[in-house]
Regions:
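Glycine-rich phosphate-binding loop signature in dinucleotide/nucleotide-binding domains
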Residues: 2-3, 97-101, 151-157, 210-213
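Conserved H-loop
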Residues: 37, 122-126, 154, 197-200
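N-terminal helical cap/lid subdomain that shapes the substrate entry/recognition surface
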Residues: 2-91, 95-99
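Substrate-recognition element of Asp-dependent hydrolases with the DxDx(T/V) motif
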Residues: 89-117
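Acidic, Mg2+-coordinating phosphoryl-transfer loop and its flanking beta/alpha structural elements
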Residues: 159-198
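Conserved Lys-Pro-Asp/Glu-containing loop-to-beta segment of HAD-superfamily phosphomonoesterases
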Residues: 5-7, 139-168
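Surface-exposed amphipathic alpha-helices with a cationic face
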Residues: 90-98, 148, 168-173
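A short, structured active-site edge motif that brings together acidic residues
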Residues: 42-43, 122-137
Length: 213
């Protein structure tokens, strides 16, 4: 019920927004620039949720600071303009906040606040924690601990919503209920196996988990 849940914290990529096409496009622009193999959207989906260094090692077996610098300078803006919110993202955030539930983002993106701002979601967020704010990436619970602490709620009063096994493992490690979303690369079975408390196929289902209609 709503009085048992005081905060709902979200992953960003493939949870609040579909970034897969934008990342796919920009990753292949980078590949062409540096003579790397082009990758499929399926490969991109497999990497979403990882820090960018690990994503690129998955894509190309390597990571170079030169690539990252070029990507940030030339393609990060292009990527952000290609990201699209899922259809019910804003409505769900409004419903949760209207019921007095705090909302936030915890992401393995560096400077997650920038992409949240670019999607005009900042007014809906009480806290945003990106990779630059912590020492350890998810599934280490550090970022989720930080968000819960900033929100001033207990772990048992918080929920973390995400689309990957990493997100669910993070929730388990933080002793927070994890809601898995099948909008990314994982199905219901995979998310449940990773520790999901509940699994949803659309964000519109999330408020109902807390008694909101």
């Amino acid at each position: 019920m709503t009085n048992e849940t005081k905060a709902v914290i979200f992953d960003f990529d493939m949870t609040l927004a579909d970034s897969s096409y934008a990342i796919h496009h920009c990753s292949n622009l980078l590949a062409r620039k540096f003579g790397l193999k082009e990758i499929s959207r399926e490969v991109v989906l497999a990497g979403i949720g990882l820090p960018i260094e690990d994503c690129w090692r998955l894509y190309w077996g390597d990571f170079k600071d030169e690539w990252l610098s070029y990507y940030r300078n030339e393609f990060r803006g292009v990527e952000q303009t290609g990201i699209r919110l899922f259809p019910n993202t804003v409505a769900v955030l409004e419903k949760l906040r209207g019921a007095g539930i705090k909302t936030g983002v915890v992401s393995n993106r560096r400077f997650a606040s920038r992409v949240v701002e670019s999607m005009n979601l900042t007014p809906y967020m009480d806290v945003i924690v990106g990779l630059e704010d912590v020492t350890n990436a998810k599934p280490d619970p550090e970022a989720l601990f930080k968000a819960v602490g900033k929100l001033g709620v207990g772990a048992g009063e918080a929920v973390y919503v995400g689309d990957t096994d990493i997100d669910m493992q993070t929730a388990v490690a933080a002793v927070v209920r994890g809601v898995g979303m099948t909008t990314g690369n994982f199905d219901e079975e995979g998310l449940a196996a990773a520790g999901a408390w509940r699994v949803c196929s659309d964000l519109i289902e999330v408020p109902g988990l807390f008694g909101l209609k």
